[in-house]
């Protein structure tokens, strides 16, 4: 137990001596940074027992502030003294800080140089090329031009004035088109006269006359009907009705043949 306590005391003494020597020999840089979407905008490496800034993220908080530079050794971030911190401990510290928090940063300058291997891999660090999310504000002239474009793209047909093809998937939702069969055929019937006749050029061609489609009844059916209707008729009347029935049957057959010929030409 005594050996362990002695070692810890010796380490603390060495660290305090190092702090004293560093503070006396190097310049202390102090600034305030606001945590943004890219954090503090720093690429930090572990150089021995210290956390050193190797690069600044383009358009990050540190790059926009312009005070911290690559090569600075971090002393404190906020109220936490980060001298002797590992990268894992430093990451845990930053994870508990929310966006928008203003932190006071202290660092030593000119104390340690960045290792050469880190200077050569600047283009390989993806954090230095983060895209900066931004939402451009639309000015009034831009809005007026968009309104004019919308009016120019409106459909001239009054029947389809509520339908417009989508210009962009992101800006204009697709609208359901109006039923073409309902709209187009609806007003066409009101404006056009339909011709009906036997001529081929007519819209509706009649192949048979309605009067000729009435077939004569069967002679047997006519005889039965006559028997039921007139039970007390004379023999001469029955003979005339039966002869009329046969004559109607012959007339129906002739008309049926004429109808077939007309349908061929139609």
From Swiss-Prot:
It comes from the Eukaryota. SMART domains: PDZ. Pfam families: PDZ. Residues 27-109 form the PDZ domain. Coiled coil: none annotated. This is PDZ domain-containing protein 9. It comes from Mus musculus (Mouse). The lineage of its organism: Eukaryota, Metazoa, Chordata, Craniata, Vertebrata.
């Amino acid at each position: 137990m005594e050996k362990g306590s002695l070692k810890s005391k010796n380490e603390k003494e060495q660290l305090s001596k190092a702090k004293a020597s560093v503070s006396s020999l190097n310049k202390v840089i102090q600034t305030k940074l606001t945590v943004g979407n890219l954090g503090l905008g720093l690429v930090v490496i572990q150089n021995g027992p210290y956390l050193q800034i190797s690069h600044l993220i383009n358009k990050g908080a540190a790059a926009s502030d312009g005070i911290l530079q690559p090569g600075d050794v971090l002393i404190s971030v906020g109220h936490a003294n980060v001298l002797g911190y590992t990268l894992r401990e430093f990451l845990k510290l930053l994870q508990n800080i929310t966006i928008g928090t203003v932190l006071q940063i202290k660092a030593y300058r000119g104390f340690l140089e960045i290792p050469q291997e880190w200077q050569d891999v600047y283009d390989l660090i993806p954090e230095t090329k983060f895209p900066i999310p931004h939402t451009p504000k639309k000015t009034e002239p831009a809005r007026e031009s968009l309104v004019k474009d919308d009016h120019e793209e409106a459909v001239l047909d009054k029947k389809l004035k509520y339908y417009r093809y989508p210009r962009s998937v992101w800006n204009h939702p697709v609208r359901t088109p109006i039923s073409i069969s309902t709209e187009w055929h609806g007003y066409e019937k009101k404006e056009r006269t339909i011709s009906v006749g036997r001529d081929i050029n007519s819209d509706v061609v009649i192949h048979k006359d309605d009067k000729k489609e009435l077939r004569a009844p069967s002679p047997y059916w006519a005889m039965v009907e006559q028997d039921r209707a007139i039970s007390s008729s004379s023999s001469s009347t029955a003979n005339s009705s039966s002869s009329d029935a046969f004559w109607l049957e012959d007339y129906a057959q002739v008309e049926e043949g004429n109808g077939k010929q007309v349908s061929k030409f139609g």
